[in-house]
């Protein structure tokens, strides 16, 4: 007798998900190494090697630092009244005027950089009884001696240097930045030759602040033929406030003010060339794409940039758990469902069906469950980017040698932040990967349960992701199962009849040895019971005598 399962009265339907021969290893909360069909790299580890000039306005400092451009060094006159989003300082920048220092260099540089402009307004300061527009051979403007264009070097007039007391109110509705300085002669002779008094003094005040500087006379290392120095200071005058300058010598006076603006402009040291291209994120190494949430190119950034982390790679799962086929089976060489392994031949969807019936074999993707999984995964990368991208910039931190402890503390804080973000990145990606794998597994289980509920008693779960259908199920029937229109009542009687026939045949053929052994055991038991009963009967009648001795 032929098995009903081997003729046209049954069919096999398997459910599965796609797989690839070589997947990608990702990390989850529960597993450091789990293979998925697809993953996206989250760490940007290289730059373009050039700084893009769009959408940010990049100002190339060339051979000028920002402070030299601010003061008006003769070789930096081209930067007068310039504006920028990012001022790029080059390693070959140099000063070519009177040697100077800025006691609070980092603060002034940061203040001017964030303002994003060198717009300068000249004001009519009145300096009575002194000689203005001093110059030096150390600061050539053309063939003649010159000086910083934004500063006015005041020296004695004749043999006198009167006490200067000048006020300048701020009647505008914006902050004004005044740059001024104090000259430190190299000798007492130079001091009296320039300012008459043996010791000068400069006091600059507003209602909110006051600075008093006394020159330090003494020789310093020679720079551009000078052993004297100028110290540069700065004062911000708020609207309605008044600038007061008082001095009896050594004053390097302002010629006007810089108009301060609030913004997100900045300055960066870089030797990367500036090119015509588009990039939101800039590092000293060059521009980098910001389509990833993390980067390990450089800690210093400008613009909307990925978060800096220590890791070289972090992969976000964008596909399901990968279970490659264990061997080449052919389409139905050894039919198996998702519980055993994935299907490497399925390219038109993530989930699908394979069937074998009287009309042959076939395969089709389930687009609904595939789309449901893809929709949930697609937004993951954008959400991670939104959580991590810097909306502003991470500026360079600079401190003088005196502020070494502050610098050490700042470095410790920055390193701690990087460690924290690197750890957060690991956890965030592991959580997202765990969620991706769980949801793709869930969609597979949902599809399997949906199919089980349709087939009911008309089919049997084979335990490997497949169903044995106990009725004739042609391609139209298979399609109705896939699209959810299958009516199990139509096939119920046929399925029950075939199931009983198949189970009966399986019982006769598959369990014959078991039945024989069970029958033999029962026969032996009955024989022993009859023999024991006969002995007891005979003992009662006296035909058999049994003596028990102790």
UniProtKB/Swiss-Prot annotation:
GO terms for biological process: clathrin-dependent endocytosis of virus by host cell; fusion of virus membrane with host endosome membrane; fusion of virus membrane with host plasma membrane; virion attachment to host cell. GO terms for cellular component: host cell plasma membrane; membrane; viral envelope; virion membrane. It is a single-pass type I membrane protein. The chain crosses the membrane at residues 515-535. The keyword Lipoprotein applies. Disulfide bonds join 14-466, 52-277, 64-76, 97-139, 281-305, 473-477. The record marks 329-330 as: Cleavage. Keywords: Clathrin- and caveolin-independent endocytosis of virus by host, Clathrin-mediated endocytosis of virus by host, Disulfide bond, Fusion of virus membrane with host endosomal membrane, Fusion of virus membrane with host membrane, Glycoprotein, Hemagglutinin, Host cell membrane, Host membrane, Host-virus interaction, Lipoprotein, Membrane, Palmitate, Transmembrane, Transmembrane helix, Viral attachment to host cell, Viral envelope protein, Viral penetration into host cytoplasm, Virion, Virus endocytosis by host, Virus entry into host cell. Glycans are attached at residues 8, 22, 38, 165, 285, 483. InterPro entries: Capsid_hemagglutn, Hemagglutn_HA1_a/b_dom_sf, Hemagglutn_influenz_A, Hemagglutn_influenz_A/B. GO terms for molecular function: host cell surface receptor binding. Residues 536-550 are cytoplasmic. Gene3D superfamilies: 3.90.20.10, 3.90.209.20. Palmitoylated. In natural infection, inactive HA is matured into HA1 and HA2 outside the cell by one or more trypsin-like, arginine-specific endoprotease secreted by the bronchial epithelial cells. One identified protease that may be involved in this process is secreted in lungs by club cells. A lipid is attached at residues 539, 546, 549 (S-palmitoyl cysteine). It is found in: Virion membrane; Host apical cell membrane. Residues 1-514 are extracellular. Binds to sialic acid-containing receptors on the cell surface, bringing about the attachment of the virus particle to the cell. This attachment induces virion internalization either through clathrin-dependent endocytosis or through clathrin- and caveolin-independent pathway. Plays a major role in the determination of host range restriction and virulence. Class I viral fusion protein. Responsible for penetration of the virus into the cell cytoplasm by mediating the fusion of the membrane of the endocytosed virus particle with the endosomal membrane. HAMAP family: INFV_HEMA. Major glycoprotein, comprises over 80% of the envelope proteins present in virus particle. The extent of infection into host organism is determined by HA. Influenza viruses bud from the apical surface of polarized epithelial cells (e.g. bronchial epithelial cells) into lumen of lungs and are therefore usually pneumotropic. The reason is that HA is cleaved by tryptase clara which is restricted to lungs. However, HAs of H5 and H7 pantropic avian viruses subtypes can be cleaved by furin and subtilisin-type enzymes, allowing the virus to grow in other organs than lungs. Belongs to the influenza viruses hemagglutinin family. Homotrimer of disulfide-linked HA1-HA2. This is Hemagglutinin.
């Amino acid at each position: 007798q032929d098995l009903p399962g081997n003729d046209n009265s049954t069919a096999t339907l398997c459910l599965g998900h796609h797989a690839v021969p070589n997947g990608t290893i990702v990390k989850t909360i529960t597993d450091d190494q789990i293979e998925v069909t697809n993953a996206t790299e989250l760490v940007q580890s290289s730059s373009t090697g050039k700084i893009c000039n769009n959408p940010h306005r990049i100002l190339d400092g060339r051979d000028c630092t920002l402070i030299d451009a601010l003061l008006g060094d003769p070789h930096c006159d081209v930067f007068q009244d310039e504006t920028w989003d990012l001022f790029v300082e080059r390693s070959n920048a140099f000063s070519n005027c009177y040697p100077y220092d800025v006691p609070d260099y980092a603060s002034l540089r940061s203040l001017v950089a964030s303002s994003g402009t060198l717009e300068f307004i000249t004001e009519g300061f009145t300096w009575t009884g002194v000689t203005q527009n001093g110059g030096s051979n150390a600061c050539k403007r053309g063939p003649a001696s010159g000086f910083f264009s934004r500063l006015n070097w005041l020296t004695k007039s004749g043999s006198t240097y009167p006490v200067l007391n000048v006020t300048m109110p701020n009647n505008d509705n914006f902050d004004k930045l005044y740059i001024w300085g104090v000259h430190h002669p190299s000798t007492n002779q130079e001091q009296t030759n320039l300012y008459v008094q043996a010791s000068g003094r400069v006091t600059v005040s507003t209602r909110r602040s006051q600075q008093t500087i006394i020159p330090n006379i003494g020789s310093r290392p020679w720079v551009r033929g000078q052993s004297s120095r100028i110290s540069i200071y700065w004062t911000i005058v708020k609207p309605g406030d008044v600038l007061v300058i008082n001095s009896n010598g050594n004053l390097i006076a302002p010629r006007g003010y810089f108009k301060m603006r609030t913004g997100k402009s900045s300055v960066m040291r870089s030797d990367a060339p500036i090119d015509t291209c588009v990039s939101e994120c800039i590092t000293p190494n060059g521009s980098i794409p910001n389509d990833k949430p993390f980067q390990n190119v450089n800690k210093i950034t400008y613009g909307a940039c990925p978060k800096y982390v220590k890791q070289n790679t972090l992969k976000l799962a964008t596909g399901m758990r990968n279970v490659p086929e264990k061997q080449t089976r052919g389409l139905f060489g050894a039919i198996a469902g998702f519980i055993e392994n994935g299907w490497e031949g399925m390219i038109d969807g993530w989930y699908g069906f394979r069937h074998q019936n009287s009309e042959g074999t076939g395969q089709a993707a389930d687009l609904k469950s595939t789309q449901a999984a893809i929709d949930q995964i697609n937004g993951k990368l954008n959400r991670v980017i939104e959580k991590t991208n810097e909306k502003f910039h991470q500026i360079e931190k600079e401190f003088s040698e005196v502020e070494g402890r502050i610098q050490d503390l700042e470095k410790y804080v920055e390193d701690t932040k990087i460690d924290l973000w690197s750890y957060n990145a690991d956890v965030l990606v592991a959580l997202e990967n765990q969620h991706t794998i769980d949801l793709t597994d869930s969609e597979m289980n949902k599809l399997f349960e949906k199919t089980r509920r349709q087939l009911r008693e008309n089919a049997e779960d084979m335990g490997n992701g497949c169903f044995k259908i106990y009725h004739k199920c042609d391609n139209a029937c298979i399609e109705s199962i896939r699209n959810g229109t299958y009516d199990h009542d139509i096939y119920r009687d046929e399925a029950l009849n075939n199931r009983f026939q198949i189970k009966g045949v399986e019982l006769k053929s598959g369990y014959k040895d078991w039945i024989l052994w069970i029958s033999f055991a029962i026969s032996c038991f009955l024989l022993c019971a009859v023999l024991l009963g006969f002995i007891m009967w005979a003992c009662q009648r006296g035909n058999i005598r049994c003596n028990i001795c102790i």
